Design a protein with these regions (language model features):
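Canonical positions in the second alpha-helix
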Residues: 17-18, 49-50, 80-81, 114-115, ...
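Short coil turns that delineate tetratricopeptide repeat
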Residues: 21-23, 52-55, 86, 119-120, ...
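Canonical tetratricopeptide repeat
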Residues: 29, 60-63, 94, 127, ...
Length: 401
């Protein structure tokens, strides 16, 4: 055939010859073939020629118009198919698809409900359940999926109804039932998204061992699955497998070197493994692209304070941190560097917000005493002792003020 030989000029000649000479039946077969291989203009021309003999090709014309983005034209073709036609249910189903494409899911649902008045086709029930799930009508979606034969629907669509029911129950907060259906779906056919949903659900229920099991399945079977490493590393951390958690986080960073969440957990795990240098490096990389740097600045300040790197803490002021604890570490840095007046200014700004923090008050009190602000120191010592009444050293200091 000319098309198979990629001789388009010869194919064009055959096409117009067929239009002039071939019967409607032969043209119908040719049009469906052309439509199937993406030659929509030629298929459309034939369908328009034979539409009187085969009114069902209004469906094909509507589908082609939809492919071309001509939605109004597609609807116009579908309106030609009346309720007494054998193709009316198909027209309603295609209308539902078009309305969904237009973002009118409620109207699409109405069309499928109308179609179900004429037919109990499982694919219509499935389509309605899919729409209900999209519209967050999860209970209705579950009822729809439950009517269907899972194996039959999977063969026709590649989608497991058990999986869909599990997802819907998860959205309803019924996690125990959700995991039952998702596990059943996974037993019948492995699916990355199902395994990920199961792992995430078990993590949220603090069943970390089971979460690790399903994350490991993904890691073994589908290591290219996007984004599982963050949850997997967190689950391993909860199971006290710290070195393995860091390894998985690093594995994720090989795919996405600037993924903020992974950089933060890699920093955390490095810090817990007493590798402060790596912890700092991960934070510095994260700081470059993160939309919100507050947590990053707090962690950096914490590392610098432990290492008595007060100048580095003061340099963080250029980032204009808003976190109160980061600001307090800046105040403490001035205090440790004997710039007491500047430290005092920072402490005063923070005092109202951190008045219930005993450690803050303790440092503030000693700063006030050193600056000779004895009355203010006594007031704060009184507040401190309300929070920590058994601090003998502070009681003695209070009595001397």
């Amino acid at each position: 055939m000319a098309l198979e030989e990629q001789d388009l000029e010869k194919a064009d000649q055959y096409f117009y010859k067929a239009l002039e000479q071939d019967s409607s039946e032969v043209l119908y077969e040719l049009a469906t073939y052309l439509e199937g291989i993406g030659f929509y203009p030629q298929a459309k021309e034939i369908y328009l020629k034979i539409v009187e003999d085969f009114p069902e090709v209004h469906l094909n014309l509507a589908a082609i118009a939809s492919e071309d983005g001509q939605i109004e034209e597609a609807f116009a073709y579908l309106e030609e198919i009346q309720a007494d036609s054998d193709w009316y249910v198909s027209a309603l189903a295609l209308k539902a698809d078009l309305y969904q494409l237009e973002g009118l899911s409620d109207v699409a649902r109405e069309k499928l409900l109308e179609a179900l008045n004429y037919s109990d086709d499982p694919l219509l029930i499935f389509g309605l359940a899919e729409l209900d799930s999209e519209l967050e009508n999860y209970q209705e979606a579950i009822q729809g999926y439950a009517q269907l034969d899972n194996r039959l629907i999977y063969e026709q669509t590649g989608i497991s109804t058990y999986q869909r029911i599990g997802f819907a129950y998860a959205q309803l907060g019924k996690f125990e039932v959700a995991t039952e259906f998702l596990e059943k779906a996974l037993e019948l056919e492995y699916d990355d998204h199902t395994a990920y949903e199961l792992a995430s659900l078990y993590f949220d229920q603090e069943e970390y061992q089971k979460a690790v099991l399903y994350f490991k399945q993904i890691d073994t079977i589908s290591p290219d699955f996007e984004g599982y490493e963050y949850g997997y590393s967190q689950a391993l951390h909860k199971e006290h497998q710290l070195e393995e958690a860091l390894r998985i986080a690093k594995q994720g960073l090989e795919k996405n070197p600037f993924e903020t969440r992974l950089l933060l957990v890699a920093s955390q795990f490095s810090y817990e493994l007493h590798d402060a240098s790596s912890a700092e490096n991960y934070l510095l990389i994260a700081k470059e692209d993160a939309e919100d740097t507050e947590e990053i600045l707090l962690r950096l300040a914490t590392i610098y304070l432990e290492q008595e790197r007060y100048e580095d803490i003061l340099d963080l002021q250029s980032e204009e941190p808003e976190n109160l604890l980061t600001k307090w570490m800046i105040a403490r840095s001035y205090q440790e560097m004997d710039d007491l007046d500047t430290a005092y200014e920072h402490y005063r700004e923070l005092a109202g917000d951190l008045k219930d923090n005993p450690e803050f008050l303790e440092h503030y009190i000693y700063l006030l005493r050193e600056l000779g602000h004895f009355e203010e120191a006594k007031i704060n010592a009184h507040d401190y002792l309300k929070l920590v009444p058994d601090d003998i050293q502070m009681q003695e200091l209070f009595e001397t003020l």
